[in-house]
Amino acid sequence: MRINFKLILIILTSFYGIINCQSTCPYSKTVINGASATFYSAMDNGNCGFGKLTGPTGPGNYMIAALGTKLYQNGAQCGQCFKISNSKNASVTVMATDSCNDAGYCQRDNHFDLSPTAFSILGAQSQGVLDGLSYVKVPCRVSGNVKVMLKDGSNAYWTSFLVFNNAIDVKQVSIKLSGSSTYVPLTQTTYNYWPSSITAGSFQVRIESIGGEFIYVTIPSVVSSKIYDTGSQFSSSC
């Protein structure tokens, strides 16, 4: 019996993502110095769109940070992880889930507004602000696969995608309608969604990491607030 491997590959990618694997770390290991940190308590429902941190789209813990205005980069850093260290070699890894827009510290080039739990690993809360920190970007220690949620209010004429639970940073999200051979790139918003007005019928979402890997998931029709498991996760040798 002759097996059509090409057909099998097409069937697999129509439902779950096949990753173009890469063996190198997509992050620069250069340590950035001169960072600072404060802490805040209103951590749920941050600007990155993850909602409640222990909810279905959140990281599942409170090891998070709101990024200063410059570091936030209009939402491009949402869902990415940073290992922050102090001069005493204490370190903590946090995920970016929010932006810090207040005047003052949040306007510094490399400022993190941490959860009280994360802040306390680096210094006493009584200090209020920590200076002289360093950081490096690292893969996120997530469990399971990359997931996609369709924004509340999505319909057959407009929808917006939240990509979450990704171990490696997302570079681009694109969609391809059923019957088309062309992927249309979407533009990320400052609140970390990827909107589209061409979602009639079945379509495929393609998620590209900064390491050049791709994950695919087919969405048969638009259902507001529905979460899709892509069945795949980005790899990393970091």
Swiss-Prot record:
Its main location: secreted. Pfam families: DPBB_1. Residues 1-21 form the signal peptide. Glycans are attached at N89. Disulfide bonds join C48-C78, C81-C140. Keywords: Disulfide bond, Glycoprotein, Secreted, Signal. Residues 45-145 form the Expansin-like EG45 domain. Belongs to the expansin family. Expansin A subfamily. May serve to lubricate the movement of the cellulose microfibrils during cell growth and wall extension and/or may serve to maintain the fluid state of the slug cell wall. This is Expansin-like protein 5. It comes from Dictyostelium discoideum (Social amoeba). The gene is expl5.
